[in-house]
Regions:
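Helix-coil boundary and interhelical linker segments in multi-pass alpha-helical membrane proteins
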Residues: 60-70, 113-132, 188-197
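Conserved small/polar residues in nucleotide/adenosyl-binding loops
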Residues: 218-219
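Basic, amphipathic juxtamembrane/active-site segments
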Residues: 86-127
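Membrane-helix boundary/juxtamembrane motif in polytopic membrane proteins
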Residues: 151-175
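Transit-peptide-like, low-complexity N-terminal presequences
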Residues: 1-31
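Membrane-embedded alpha-helical segments that form the functional core of polytopic membrane enzymes
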Residues: 45-98, 196
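Core segments of transmembrane alpha-helices
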Residues: 52-56, 107-115, 172-186
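Membrane-water interface of transmembrane alpha-helices
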Residues: 141-155
Length: 220
């Protein structure tokens, strides 16, 4: 089996449900135009992860300089590379504990660091910074250590409302790393830093409440 066939087979085994923003990044951009050519090169997933960290740092630097459009675009490139490294690792069977640790570390530093950096640049208030950071990290902790554990115990989960409508069509409605990056990038490019913090924090809290209700509803 040649590389093209191997990758196409792997693509068919990819999960069928995507977050909408994740579908845009993974399926419409990376799988269509980037993954196959990149997989034929000696470039490693860890190199892509390090490259993503460089683009994130450049985004921070351009924020400091006041070049917000460039900073927002660089942050989008970081997010795209963040998707590419994991997909490349799976397709080339190069997944490793070190790679996973590196990827998670870069993501945590970038997504937490951006709000802290904006505060120290006097672009957002302390309240907005804390709201975004607390909402994001509470969401991550509860979904990782409680909700996902509950889902593993259930054969299925009862969803309702708009999320059910999207799921029936193969899409997950909620916030993920790609949507978070898009919101941050848009906020940077528009210079709407304070609003971006409250929008991001609000979406995290709303999505968390929905997921907790869905888990409780399933147990009934």
């Amino acid at each position: 089996m040649d590389l093209d066939e191997k990758l196409k087979k792997a693509q068919r085994l990819e999960k069928k449900s995507y977050y909408i923003s994740e579908y845009l990044f993974r399926v419409l951009i990376i799988q269509k135009f980037i993954l196959l050519p990149l997989a034929k090169t000696p470039i490693t997933p860890n190199f892509i992860t390090i490259l993503s960290a460089i683009f994130a740092a450049l985004s921070f630097y351009f924020i400091y300089l006041g070049h917000f459009i460039c900073a927002g675009l660089l942050f989008l490139v970081y997010s795209l590379l963040d998707h590419i490294d994991g997909m490349l690792a799976r397709y080339k069977n190069l997944s490793s504990k070190i790679g996973k640790l590196l990827d998670v570390s870069v993501d945590n530093l970038t997504f937490n660091g951006i709000f802290i950096f904006l505060f120290f640049c006097d672009l957002i208030s302390l309240q907005a910074c804390i709201f975004a950071l607390v909402s994001m990290n509470i969401y991550n902790c509860i979904t990782t250590f409680y909700i996902l554990n509950q889902l593993r115990k259930l054969k299925s989960i009862k969803r309702f409302g708009l999320k059910k409508w999207f799921l029936d069509r193969g899409f997950l409605l909620g916030i993920d790393a790609s949507l978070l990056a898009i919101l941050i990038s848009a906020g940077i490019m528009l210079g709407a830093f304070e609003l971006m913090c409250y929008v991001v924090g609000g979406i995290f809290l709303f999505d968390l409440c929905y997921r907790l209700i869905a888990v409780s509803y399933t147990h009934l």
